[in-house]
Amino acid sequence: TEYGAILMDPPYHAHAFDGALAVIYNQGTKENSGIFSQSQGWLILAEALRGHGERAFTYFMENSPAAQNDCAEIRRLEPYCYGQFTEGKASKHFGRSHVHWLTGTASTVMVGCVEGILGLRPDLEGLRLSPSVPKSWKHFEIEKVFRGKQLHISVENPDEKESGCCSLVLNGQKLADNYIPENLLQDKNEVVLTL
């Protein structure tokens, strides 16, 4: 939806089986066909890991508080915070968000954006660069401090791809793939990734 992915559809109208407690909530709210904010971050990450940059960014924008300022009278939460959930299309208050400051959404969306959309994926030995972005992003830059080393990362997308790696250059040296071993990093680093 324009406010994020619905948890399930259609909503429960009655107990479908023992333990189907979603029916205790009004249709379109919370677990009964609402739009849970925290899971949106994992959806962003999942689409990015599949290389679907357009979809990952769309999911981010649908649930981003800052992107909903033009519908503040519907959303009814502060423009700088996530709610726990937004009422789904089965509700007569579709788009209204609830329970601000009681959610882990900011952290899951941050992981979805940093590791997914921007593609900065650290591990024990180094850093993998694997952005999944909208095709229209022809160039963007990232300033990152990674294990005490400064990285200036330029991402070039001349062929309007959503993901992939054509080349990765670290301090003028072309690397074998999209992975930067930590032992190659200097105090200050210039990184150019071409999709």
Predicted features along the sequence, with ranges:
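Extended glycan-interaction surfaces of carbohydrate-active proteins
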Residues: T1-S37, Q68-H93, L118
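Carbohydrate-active enzyme catalytic cores, enriched for enzymes
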Residues: T1-Y3, T29-N32, Q40, R50, ...
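Alpha-helical support elements that line or immediately flank enzyme active sites
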Residues: Q40-N63
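A generic secondary-structure signal for well-formed alpha-helical elements
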Residues: G51-E54, N63-C71, I117-R121
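Hydrophobic alpha-helical bundle architecture
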Residues: A56-F60, A67, G95-S97, L127
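Residue-level detector of alpha-helical recognition elements and their boundaries
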Residues: T58, C71, E78, R128-L129, ...
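Residue-level signal for alpha-helical context at structural boundaries
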Residues: M61, I74, C81, P131-S132
